[in-house]
C-alpha cells in the first residue's frame, strides 16, 4: 500500500531538487519561445491524477479493457469541449503530441510515395510538413512551397506547384510564420487538383479558439493542433474535422491501433480542463493581448533598425533577421540567455548559416502575456533585447538587463500565492 505521506521531496530528493530549480527558473526568466507557455494549476492537477493508472485502449464506449466507465466520461468531456471550442463535428483527443496527430493524418489520407505539398522548414514550416529528415519527407514525395522576398506565402506559387505536381494532400500551417493564412485560397487550390487540405494549427490554435484568428475547420478536410503553445494546456495533440464518416473512421484507426496503443487519460483530462478554460470570456482577452504584445515588440525591433521578416506580425510570433547585423542566432540566443531571457535561434529566409547556427531569432508572446505583461512591458523588454544585440559581447549590458529582468519577473510572477 502506498502512503500519501511519502512525498517526492522525501523519496527522491535529487529529482525533486532539479524540479524545484526548474520551477525557479520559470519564475526568474522571461520566456519568449513561441511554442512555450505556462499551464494552470488545474491542468497540472489533472495531469498528475490517478487517471495515469488506467489503461483504456479503444474509444469511449468501445474499450478493450474493463473498468473504463469513468475514463469514458473524462475522454468524452474532452471530445465534446474540443468540438464546441473549434466548431468541429469530429474530435480525437488521444494523440500524444502534435507530430503523432500529424502522422495519423498522413496514415489516414495518403499512402507512402504519394505527393504531399507543404511549407518548407527553411521558410517557416514544420518537420512534419515534408522535411527530408522527418517521416513526412522520407515516406512521401514531399514538394515544398515557401515565402516570397517580402516574407509572405506566395499563393500563386503554391497553386503553380499544385498544378505541376498534383499532390494528394496539401499541408497548411507553420512553426515560424507571422502572418494570417488564407484558408479559402488553400481550399481553392486543393479543389483544383483534387487534393485533401490538411491544416496544422498547432501554433495558432489558441488564437483560433478565441476568435482572433480565422478558423480553418470549415475549410479543411482535417485540422490538427497541439494542446500546449497558445492553447495553454498540457503537452499533447488533437485532431479535428467536419462531419465525414469515412474520414472519421480512417482517422480513428490511424490513431488507434495504427499509431498508438493506450491513450494517456491523465493528459486527456488535462486537455479537458484546458478546453474549458479556453471557452471562458477571459481567454479571448488573453489571446487579444498576445497579439497586441507581439505587435508592440516587433515594432520596437523595426524602430531600432532590425529586419523583422514580413515587416511585422499578425499573430503571436515574429522572426528577427540578424543578417544585416552580422550576428548569428546562436550567439544572440546565448547572450540573451545570460540575461535570463529565453528565445530560440531560428533560420530566416535565404539564411546563409546552418540550422545549428542560424541568422535569426524567433520571438513569441504567449508566455509573457500569461504572466500579465501588456504592451508597455513588452516594448520595454524588446528594448532590452535590442540593447544586448547591438553590443553582444558587452557583459556589463547583459548584467544590467538581467537585473531588470529579475525585477520585472518579481512584479509579474507566473504562479501567485
Swiss-Prot record:
It comes from the Bacteria. Its main location: cytoplasm. One of its GO terms (cellular component) is cytosol. It holds the Pfam family SHMT. One of its GO terms (molecular function) is pyridoxal phosphate binding. The record marks 228 as: Plays an important role in substrate specificity. The keyword Cytoplasm applies. Keywords: Amino-acid biosynthesis, Cytoplasm, One-carbon metabolism, Pyridoxal phosphate, Transferase. Its cofactor is pyridoxal 5'-phosphate. It is found in: Cytoplasm. It catalyses: (6R)-5,10-methylene-5,6,7,8-tetrahydrofolate + glycine + H2O = (6S)-5,6,7,8-tetrahydrofolate + L-serine. (6S)-5,6,7,8-tetrahydrofolate binds at residues 121, 125-127, 354-356. GO terms for biological process: glycine biosynthetic process from serine; tetrahydrofolate interconversion. Catalyzes the reversible interconversion of serine and glycine with tetrahydrofolate (THF) serving as the one-carbon carrier. This reaction serves as the major source of one-carbon groups required for the biosynthesis of purines, thymidylate, methionine, and other important biomolecules. Also exhibits THF-independent aldolase activity toward beta-hydroxyamino acids, producing glycine and aldehydes, via a retro-aldol mechanism. NCBIfam families: PRK00011.1. This is Serine hydroxymethyltransferase. It comes from Azotobacter vinelandii (strain DJ / ATCC BAA-1303). The lineage of its organism: Bacteria, Pseudomonadati, Pseudomonadota, Gammaproteobacteria, Pseudomonadales.
Amino acid at each position: 500500500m502506498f502512503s500519501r505521506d511519502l512525498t517526492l521531496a522525501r523519496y527522491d530528493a535529487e529529482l525533486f531538487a532539479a524540479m524545484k530549480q526548474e520551477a525557479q527558473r520559470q519564475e526568474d526568466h522571461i520566456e519568449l519561445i513561441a511554442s512555450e507557455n505556462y499551464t494552470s494549476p488545474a491542468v497540472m492537477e489533472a495531469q498528475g491524477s490517478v487517471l495515469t493508472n488506467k489503461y483504456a485502449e479503444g474509444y469511449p464506449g468501445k474499450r478493450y479493457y474493463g473498468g473504463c466507465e469513468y475514463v469514458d466520461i473524462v475522454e468524452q468531456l474532452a471530445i465534446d469541449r474540443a468540438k464546441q471550442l473549434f466548431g468541429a463535428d469530429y474530435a480525437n483527443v488521444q494523440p500524444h503530441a502534435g507530430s503523432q496527430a500529424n502522422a495519423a493524418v498522413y496514415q489516414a489520407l495518403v499512402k507512402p510515395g504519394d505527393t504531399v505539398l507543404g511549407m518548407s522548414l527553411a521558410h517557416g514550416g514544420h518537420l512534419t510538413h515534408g522535411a527530408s529528415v522527418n517521416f513526412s519527407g522520407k515516406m512521401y514525395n514531399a514538394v515544398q512551397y515557401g515565402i516570397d522576398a517580402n516574407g509572405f506565402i506566395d499563393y500563386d506559387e503554391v497553386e503553380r506547384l499544385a498544378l505541376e505536381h498534383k499532390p494528394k494532400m496539401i499541408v497548411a500551417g507553420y512553426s515560424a510564420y507571422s502572418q494570417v493564412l488564407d484558408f479559402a485560397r488553400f481550399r481553392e487550390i486543393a479543389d483544383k487538383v483534387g487534393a485533401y487540405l490538411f491544416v496544422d494549427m498547432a501554433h495558432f490554435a489558441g488564437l483560433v479558439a478565441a476568435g482572433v484568428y480565422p478558423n480553418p475547420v470549415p475549410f479543411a478536410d482535417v485540422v490538427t493542433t497541439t494542446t500546449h503553445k497558445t492553447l495553454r494546456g498540457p503537452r499533447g495533440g488533437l485532431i479535428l474535422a467536419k462531419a465525414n464518416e469515412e474520414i472519421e473512421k480512417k482517422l480513428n484507426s490511424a490513431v488507434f491501433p495504427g499509431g498508438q496503443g493506450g491513450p494517456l487519460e491523465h493528459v486527456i483530462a488535462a486537455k479537458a480542463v484546458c478546453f474549458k478554460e479556453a471557452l471562458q470570456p477571459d481567454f479571448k482577452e488573453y489571446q487579444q493581448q498576445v497579439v497586441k504584445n507581439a505587435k508592440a515588440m516587433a515594432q520596437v525591433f523595426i524602430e531600432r533598425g532590425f529586419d523583422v521578416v514580413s515587416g511585422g506580425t499578425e499573430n503571436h510570433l515574429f522572426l528577427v533577421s540578424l543578417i544585416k547585423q552580422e550576428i548569428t542566432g546562436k550567439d544572440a540566443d546565448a547572450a540573451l540567455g545570460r540575461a535570463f531571457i529565453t528565445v530560440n535561434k531560428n533560420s530566416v529566409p535565404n539564411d546563409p548559416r546552418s540550422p545549428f547556427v542560424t541568422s535569426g531569432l524567433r520571438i513569441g508572446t504567449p508566455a509573457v502575456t500569461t504572466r500579465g505583461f501588456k504592451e508597455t512591458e513588452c516594448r520595454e523588454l524588446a528594448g532590452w533585447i535590442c540593447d544586448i544585440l547591438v553590443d553582444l559581447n558587452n557583459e556589463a549590458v547583459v548584467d544590467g538587463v538581467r537585473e531588470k529582468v529579475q525585477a520585472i519577473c518579481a512584479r509579474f510572477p507566473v504562479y501567485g500565492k
